[in-house]
Amino acid sequence: VFDSGGNIIEYLKNINTNQGIDDMVLISYDFQAGSYIKKAEKNSEYEGKRTDIYAEIFNNLGDFDSIMEVGVGEGTTFSNIVPKLNNRNVASFGFDISYSRIQYGQKHLKGKKMDSSLLFTGNFFNCPIQNDSVDIVYSIHSLEPNGGKEKEILTELYRITRKYLVLIEPIYELSSEQSKVHMDKHGYVKNIYKIALELGYKVTDYRILFEDNLQSDNNTGVVIIEKNSKILSKRENISPLGCPVTKLPLSLHKEHYYCKDSLLLYPVINKIPCLLPENAIVATHFFD
C-alpha cells in the first residue's frame, strides 16, 4: 500500500481491523519514516516561508523558555522553527508515536547542529510530560487524523501546557467544501474551537492561516489557547519529562529513565527515550 502511494490509515480502516486509531497512525507513520525529510529538502523555500509564519506566531506570544512539538515526526518543521525564535536559549522538545521517525529526526537535528533539542517517543493521549511543565506546546497537522478524540487530546495537551497551547491544524468549520469532503473521508478532527470553549479554555486566536490556500484539501488554521501567560518564573534545569502512566517526574539513571514514584523504568535506545505507556518496565529494585 505504501509503495503504491496509498493511504495506509484508510486501508487499515477499510479492512475492518480491530486496531485503534493510534495504532493505525503508528503503523502508517513508521512506514513513512524518512520520506518527510526528503520532501522538505526538495521544498526548502516553501518550508522556510511556512515556518517564518509559525515562528512569528510563537514570538508574538511574549517571553517563554521552553517549547515542544507534539507529533514532531522527523523534525523537519521543528528544525526550521526553533532557530527563528527570539529566545536563542529556549529549551526545545518534541515527541512522536513512531520510533523510526524520531530516529530519522534525531539524525536530521544533528545535521542542523541542534543537539540540545530532545526528541523522544510518546503519544498525545498519554503524554510523557509532567503537569504545567512546558511554556508553549504546539502541534502542526499531527492531530488531524484523530477525529472523535478531540476532547481527550485537548484535555491532555492542556494538562502539560504552562502558558500557551497552539494548534496549527486544518479547521473543518472554516474550510472550503472541497476540504470538508477530504476531512470527512479521512476522519479528521472537528470542532476544536467549540470543544475548547466547552472545556472552559480561553481561546485567543481562531482563524485560517493561509487565505490563498482555501481551495486545498488541508486548510491550515490556528487555534491558540492561553492557559497562564502571566507566569514569570522559570523552570530552570528542570526536565519536563514525566511517567506517561502517573505523570510524575522521570529521572535519568543508569542511562535510562526511571520514575521512583511508580517504580516504572523506560528504556533509552540509541539515545532515544522510549516513553510510550507500553514501554514501561516494572523495576522495583532498579536502584539496588
Name each model feature, range by range.
Residues 64-73:
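Conserved class I S-adenosyl-L-methionine
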Residues 162-172:
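Conserved beta-strand signature within the Rossmann-like core of class I S-adenosyl-L-methionine
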